Amino acid sequence: MDHLKKYITEINDYPKKGIVFKDLNPIYKEPKIWKELMFPLQNLISTKKPDYIAGIESRGFISASALAFKLEIGLITIRKPNKLPGEVIGTNYKLEYGEDRLEIQQNIMEKDSKIMLFDDLLATGGTAGAAGNLIKKAGGNLIGYAFLVELTELKGRENLDSNLFVETLIKY
């Protein structure tokens, strides 16, 4: 998948100074390229037989919704504070460049549902780790993590449950 790196734009000092942002929008605007990237993930995730894919706000929603649609399974959204209606469960966590909070609707899934967590990028693992803990706190059975891009030098995998499936397609 390294040949797809040419479609990923790098933006220095965004969203904060010292961060090199990986912009996947050029991939999303090219249907054939996006399909080439998504097809292996679709196949891998289907072997795990999840009940739901949980996408992390906001860039995780894009591909998570496409995967859920293709796999004919439900989509669960994990959002930033005050974006979901009704009762929510939340958790605070540290980012590569600060602190944040994630929330999930309290009764969005059946107890012990198999959940595959998806985000566009794995950096430090803080966001994905917090989202995984949130799924467990909400009664879900987290079965793995999937990402389009991984920044390997930040060792984000070390902050994820090592007993679970972790898949990334493009590594930097």
UniProtKB/Swiss-Prot annotation:
Pfam families: Pribosyltran. One of its GO terms (biological process) is purine ribonucleoside salvage. Pathway: Purine metabolism; AMP biosynthesis via salvage pathway; AMP from adenine: step 1/1. GO terms for cellular component: cytoplasm. Keywords: Cytoplasm, Glycosyltransferase, Purine salvage, Transferase. One of its GO terms (molecular function) is adenine phosphoribosyltransferase activity. Its EC number is 2.4.2.7. Coiled coil: none annotated. It comes from the Bacteria. InterPro entries: Ade_phspho_trans, PRibTrfase_dom, PRTase-like, UPRTase/APRTase. It is found in: Cytoplasm. Its main location: cytoplasm. It catalyses: AMP + diphosphate = 5-phospho-alpha-D-ribose 1-diphosphate + adenine. Homodimer. Catalyzes a salvage reaction resulting in the formation of AMP, that is energically less costly than de novo synthesis. Belongs to the purine/pyrimidine phosphoribosyltransferase family. This is Adenine phosphoribosyltransferase. It comes from Prochlorococcus marinus (strain NATL2A). The lineage of its organism: Bacteria, Bacillati, Cyanobacteriota, Cyanophyceae, Synechococcales.
